Every structure is written in C-alpha cells, then in structure tokens.
C-alpha cells in the first residue's frame, strides 16, 4: 500500500478516492507535459461545478425509471432515461486523451447505471479517449522530425544568405542591412527552437523537474518568435517611408528600426512571462492550452495587419507613378516590394488558420501537418524570397561566376600553352641530338621555331587556342 501511494501522482490519488472511478481502466494516462497540479485543479473544478449543478437542477417529471445525475470521477452526467446511452466528449485532462472522441455511459433498463461485470461497480467507457494513443505518438514523432528538418533547412539557407550579404560589399545598403537583421532573428529563432525541441520538449524528466532554465528558454523562444515578425514590419515600414513618405529618399535612421525589431518584442514576452507565472504556471510553460498566448500572438497579428496595409499602399503609389511617369526607378522599387508583399501573407496565414482547427481526428492531423510546415519552414521561405530569388543577388553571383570562369579558363589556357611549347622544344632537341644537324639548321629548327610558336600562342586573343 505504501509503495502504491509513493508511485501515484496527486492526480491519480484524487481519482482513486472518487467513488465511481472505473476500476477496469488498466492504463491511467500520465500527463508529462502539463503540471500535475494544473491537471488536478481542472478535475477538482469540474467536480465542484458538477455537485453545484446536481444540487441546483430541478428534478424532471420522471416517467419510468431514470438513472440519476452523477459524478464519475472525471465527468458529470445528467439524468438519463432507462435503456439509453449518454455521450459526451473526452476531457482534456491528459495529453494522450483525444477531446474529439466520445465517452459513453449506459443507463440500464432498470434505471441504474451500468455495472462492470468484473468489478460490479458503476463504469464509464473511457477506452476510446486513448484508443489512438499509439497513432498519436507516431504523428507527434513525425511532427517533431518535420520541425527539426524545417529548422535545419532554414538555418542552412539563412547562413548561406548572410554569407552572401556580408561577402559581396556591392550589396551593402540600408535595405540589405534590414535583411541581415531579419535573417539573423530567424537564425536565432531556429537555434533556440532546435534546442527547445531536443533538450526540453523531448525530455520528460526535465519537464517533470520543471527547472527555471526551461522557463527562461521558453521566454527567449517567444521573444525571438516575436522578433521575426517585427523585423518583417521594419521591412514594410522602411519601404513605405522610402517610397510613399520620403519620395525615394535614400538614407533613413536605422536606430528606430533596431528598437522596434529587437526591443519591442521584449514587452509582450515579459508580460506573458509574468502572467504565466501567476495564472497558468504549468511545467516549463509548455502547454498551449491557455489564452495567455494571445499576449504574444496579438501584437504579431497587429504587426502583420499594419505591414499588409503599408505594402498595399506602396503598391498603389507605385502603380500611380508608373502610369503617370513610366519611371524605371518605380519599376525597380516594385520588384523590391513584390517580395515582401508575397512573404507577409505567407508568414501570417497560420494566424488566419489558427482559430479554425477541425474537430475530427484525421482532419485535425492534416491541420497539424500544415501548421508545422507554415511555422517551421519560415526561415527557408524568407531566405529563398529575399536572397536566392533577389535579382540583385542573382546579378552579383552571375558576374562573379563569369569572372571566375574567365580567370580559371585563362590560367588553364596559359599553363596548357606553356606545356605545349616545352614539349615541342624538348622533342626538337632530341631530334637534334640523334641526327647531328648543323648549327644553321639547329638555329632554325631548335630555337627559332619553338619561340615563335610559344609567342604566337601566348599572344592569341582566344585563351583556349
């Protein structure tokens, strides 16, 4: 008995103490991702509300036998007519419970709740709640590796892009400086996400210990997540100021952009951390089942909407200028805006889809895959659109590649010509030694001719002649 009590979690102890817990449930799910205190509070709250409801509800006009309202340890059940089966959705107390599945409780023909034949106690069928646990675990692992691959690809592409921007000095300008900061924020976000997924979210023992370090890492993760979107906002503000406000003025003070991109996301991240510690202090703040996350998501959605407004206004101004003046400069700015205009909806579509998660198991799984691709492959998307598809970057890379080919080809042709001339000279010298040709012929064949050949080759306009 002592060993049993030591092994049971507080949630398990509470459930066992309840009068109608299903003794036939062989597996009691252990929630490793939520704080057990939070789970226990949910059950206690549901039990309190159930007993209040039982006392307040009036008795219905009973015609025939009826199973009385009751609390079974996890859910509250209303009065049910004899011979009927009552249903409701599975509770969300545990990580491996699927809230889209149904719990059933049978009211027998004699007006009593169904008794399990083995235990002879009232029994509620919760078996469907974790029926797909193994499939859910497989899906969770697939999503885990999908996220790791996405951030790995994002990290690689972003570092290559930053290398291009720093190496080629001809690309240096204020807009590229903003690109560098945007890319760097995505690099940091990918690094902290990989650390979070491998060292925290995948470590049940660490989550159970709930050290302060894992909450600090979650704070940094949410802060960098906000930096991504506010640097996107900086891109939109810069283009709007450059094209609409300053009328193609070139220089702007970047200090305000640094404050907005790196400084402002600290505010919602700090407010979220304080609120989370007081109102939903689960282990490592790993749960997403709290409205406190709107403290983070709200400013991000506002930044996306403001950015979209700026970009649409920029397009309107540029189209007007192109119709009136047909300036080539306006056309160039339109190309610069197009990349940002494409990227903002792509980065923001996850927040459009977020409130509309479907209820079904299969449709919910498809939704999870789509959301993971949208969230964890953003760095790859940003690097591709802002760097690899950038006309300026492509032009610089093409010019340097052509210069390298010409330089390499010239060096190769020069060394080939030298080898050819050396081979000709050595061959004639061998002939000279074998046949003892006179000095006049030796001058013509052994020295003069190869020298002329070598000179003509080295002076040729075609390096591959």
Swiss-Prot record:
This protein's UniProt keywords: Cell membrane, Disulfide bond, G-protein coupled receptor, Glycoprotein, Membrane, Receptor, Signal, Transducer, Transmembrane, Transmembrane helix
Disulfide bonds: 50-76, 67-107, 90-129
Pfam families tied to this protein: 7tm_2, HRM
Keyword Cell division recorded: no
Membrane topology: Multi-pass membrane protein
Glycosylation sites: 22, 68, 120, 125, 289
Entry's Gene Ontology molecular function annotations: adrenomedullin receptor activity; calcitonin gene-related peptide receptor activity; calcitonin receptor activity
Signal peptide bounds: 1-17
Cytoplasmic side: 167-177, 241-254, 317-331, 390-465
InterPro entries, per database record: GPCR_2, GPCR_2-like_7TM, GPCR_2_calcitonin_rcpt_fam, GPCR_2_CGRP1_rcpt, GPCR_2_extracell_dom_sf, GPCR_2_extracellular_dom, GPCR_2_secretin-like, GPCR_2_secretin-like_CS
Family per record: Belongs to the G-protein coupled receptor 2 family.
Protein name per Swiss-Prot or TrEMBL: Calcitonin gene-related peptide type 1 receptor
Annotated source species: Oncorhynchus gorbuscha
Gene: calcrl
